[in-house]
Amino acid sequence: MTTFNNLPSIFVPLVGLVFPAIAMASLFLHIQKNKIF
């Protein structure tokens, strides 16, 4: 149960870092794709 209680403290910063990184990467690729055409 201790691992289950400690899971949110690891999972929340991970999601907080991963989701903006994916959003930034997709936005960057979208801009790069628009520059080529």
From Swiss-Prot:
The chain crosses the membrane at residues 9-29. GO terms for biological process: photosynthesis. GO terms for cellular component: chloroplast thylakoid membrane; photosystem I. It comes from the Eukaryota. InterPro entries: PSI_PsaI, PSI_PsaI_sf. It is a single-pass membrane protein. Pfam families: PSI_8. Keywords: Chloroplast, Membrane, Photosynthesis, Photosystem I, Plastid, Thylakoid, Transmembrane, Transmembrane helix. It is found in: Plastid, Chloroplast thylakoid membrane. Belongs to the PsaI family. May help in the organization of the PsaL subunit. This is Photosystem I reaction center subunit VIII. It comes from Arabidopsis thaliana (Mouse-ear cress). The gene is psaI.
